């Protein structure tokens, strides 16, 4: 009976993480209190992050075993919610066996940093005036963003699958990373790609492009090309 009651309380608490009234089905989820407000999030250590925008800020974490939770850190530092695994003094591999997950509901988000093999998945959309997205080191981002100005950095084998709208997009992709953004429609785009990386995007009005060292930029839409610079096997193509 106690176990059933605990599960019910957890389910009710986790409804705050959905944009509508969807329930997150995770029997291992534990709600954590927040020490303050935040407008940025940083996640690392191979943690899977599930994000939703709503009227409240809320946080829950989950792991395959209770032993991982003590080192599963969540803290707010200078307006940034940092989510990571403290591996000091222990042998740790972010190979997925611990099944570390974080569920975050936010009111306003201006910056998201995803690194060290973590995944970030958006439930619904992120809506912001200016938004910065940084994904690196084999990490993955998947979601919808609507922003007036969107700045994206992708590097070191990371991958972004993004949809939404923006007035201005600045994207820098390097070191084998991939920006899959045909479903992201922007008016103006400044794109820089290098070292075997790729950019795919839809542009309505104007493109500035720089491709080098085997990097490729592929774009759809009606954009006029304002400036193109290619070198060392880089390419810019309309599809």
Where are these regions (language model features)?
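Intrinsically disordered, low-complexity terminal regions
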Residues: 1-239
């Amino acid at each position: 009976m106690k176990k059933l009651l605990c599960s019910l309380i957890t389910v009710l608490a986790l409804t705050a993480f959905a944009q509508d009234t969807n329930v997150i089905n995770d029997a291992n989820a534990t709600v954590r209190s927040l020490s303050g407000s935040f407008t940025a999030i940083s996640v690392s250590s191979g943690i899977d992050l599930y994000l939703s925008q709503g009227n409240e800020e809320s946080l829950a974490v989950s792991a395959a075993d209770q032993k991982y939770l003590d080192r599963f850190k969540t803290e707010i530092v200078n307006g940034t919610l940092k989510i990571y695994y403290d591996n000091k003094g222990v042998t740790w591999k972010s190979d997925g066996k611990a099944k570390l997950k974080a569920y975050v509901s936010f009111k306003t988000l201006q910056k998201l940093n995803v690194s060290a093999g973590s995944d970030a998945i958006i439930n619904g959309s992120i809506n912001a005036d200016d938004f910065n997205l940084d994904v690196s080191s084999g990490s993955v981002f998947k979601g919808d963003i609507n922003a007036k100005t969107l700045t994206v950095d992708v590097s070191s084998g990371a991958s972004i699958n993004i949809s939404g709208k923006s007035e201005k997009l600045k994207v820098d992709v390097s070191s084998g990373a991939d920006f899959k953004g045909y479903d992201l429609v922007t008016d103006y785009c400044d794109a820089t790609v290098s070292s075997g990386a790729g950019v795919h995007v839809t542009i309505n009005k104007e493109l500035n492009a720089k491709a080098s060292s085997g990097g490729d930029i592929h774009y759809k839409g009606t954009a006029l090309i304002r400036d193109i610079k290619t070198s060392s096997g880089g390419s810019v193509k309309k599809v």
